[in-house]
A protein has these predicted regions:
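PAS and PAS-like sensory/regulatory domains
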Residues: 134-138
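Short catalytic/binding micro-motifs of nucleotide second-messenger systems
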Residues: 80-88, 122-133, 164
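Short hydrophobic/aromatic beta-strand micro-patches
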Residues: 105-107, 143
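Cyclic nucleotide signaling catalytic output domains
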Residues: 94, 139-168, 172-193
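Short, low-complexity N-terminal regulatory "tails/caps" that precede and couple sensory modules
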Residues: 1-12
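A short pre-motif secondary-structure segment
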Residues: 86-96
């Protein structure tokens, strides 16, 4: 078999060379698999989208190498936070989204728990520099998968709330609202009949 043919059939790498997080395609494949599992089991999961605030300014002022250091530091800090005992009730996957953004899949996980995790991550990043004396902050969008929702819809909702966090001053967490399930609505309606 020729080298060209072998190169074409080789699997794409699963881990980002810089952050050692899952690559975007590998993370999205896991997200799709977990959505199918959640659809069968009813166990909720959440997606967190973390984006370094003003990364372009860091690259412009300190060089791309400094920006890379910040991303490596962000991935390491995220790993340390999710390894803390407070978060052991869930399993986590860390992936590289794009540019200065990382994704975390938390399963099983309610939106309220994901919001607390996001705040812990935000605080851990702001607490001390991520790299060579560069203090940074992150904005984080959080969304819980709605049963029957596509991965594209989940990603779009998570991106929207991340943009809201950026618009309202950065260094904050925003959570996408999740409408109550039909069962919860039926219980509430039953209370008022």
């Amino acid at each position: 078999m020729s080298e060209t043919l072998l190169a074409g059939t080789a699997k794409a790498p699963s881990f980002d060379a810089l952050t050692l997080a899952l690559t975007r395609p590998a993370f999205l494949a896991e997200l799709a698999e977990q959505a199918q599992i959640a659809g069968r089991s009813g166990n909720a999961f959440c997606l967190l989208l973390l984006d370094v605030d003003h990364l372009q300014n860091i690259n412009d002022c300190h060089g791309v190498g400094a920006g890379d250091e910040v991303l490596v530091g962000l991935a390491d800090r995220a790993r340390r936070v999710i390894a803390e005992p407070a978060w052991h009730r869930s399993e986590y996957s860390l992936g590289r989204y794009d540019g200065g953004a990382l994704m975390i899949l938390a399963r099983p996980c309610a939106a309220s728990q994901a919001e607390m995790l996001a705040e812990a991550l935000r605080f851990a990043v702001a607490e001390k520099p991520l790299g060579e004396r560069i203090s940074v902050t992150v904005s984080i969008g959080v969304a819980q998968l709605r049963i029957g929702e596509s991965i594209d819809e989940l990603l779009a909702r998570t991106e929207r709330v991340l943009h809201v966090a950026k618009q309202f001053g950065r260094d904050r967490v925003e959570v996408a609202s999740t409408p109550p399930s039909r069962v919860a609505r039926a219980k509430v309606v039953g209370l008022y009949d």
